[in-house]
Curated annotation (Swiss-Prot):
Organism domain of life: Bacteria
Transmembrane segments: none
Record protein name field: UPF0231 protein YPO3414/y0772/YP_0271
Record family assignment: Belongs to the UPF0231 family.
Organism (species): Yersinia pestis
Length: 119
């Protein structure tokens, strides 16, 4: 899972991830947007589920984050749409709408993100 933290001309932080993990970057850009309190909340929740069978979720406007003792899932809320709502022959391209990664790797990303936005 490769990623980079960037700043645009206005100074806003943008996060880009490698193929297969793009949704984590979209989630950080759309749902977190540099909110350190939200990062604290997620890291506290991760500590609470680490090594257990418990799960935790953080629904957002565009994406929902799920944590369990070993794994993280970021999923676009649009994937909750019922297939009956679509025209016949149409389907969603969801490669950039769902991602799984290890909890420890995800926490390293959040640590790097926090360091980048506070520098």
């Amino acid at each position: 899972m490769d990623y980079e933290f960037l700043r645009d001309l206005t100074g806003q932080v943008l996060v880009k991830f490698s193929m297969g993990h793009e949704v984590i970057g979209h989630w950080l850009n759309e749902e977190i947007k540099g909110d350190l309190v939200k990062l604290d909340h997620i890291e506290t929740a991760a500590d609470g589920v680490r090594g257990s069978e418990r799960q935790w979720q953080l629904p957002g406007h565009e994406y929902t984050l799920w944590l369990d003792g070993e794994e993280v899932m970021v999923r676009a809320n649009q994937l909750d749409l019922d297939g009956d709502e679509m025209e016949e022959g149409m389907n969603y391209y969801d490669e950039e709408s769902l991602c799984l990664c290890g909890l420890e790797d995800f926490l390293l990303v959040l640590k790097g993100y926090r360091a980048f936005i506070t520098q």
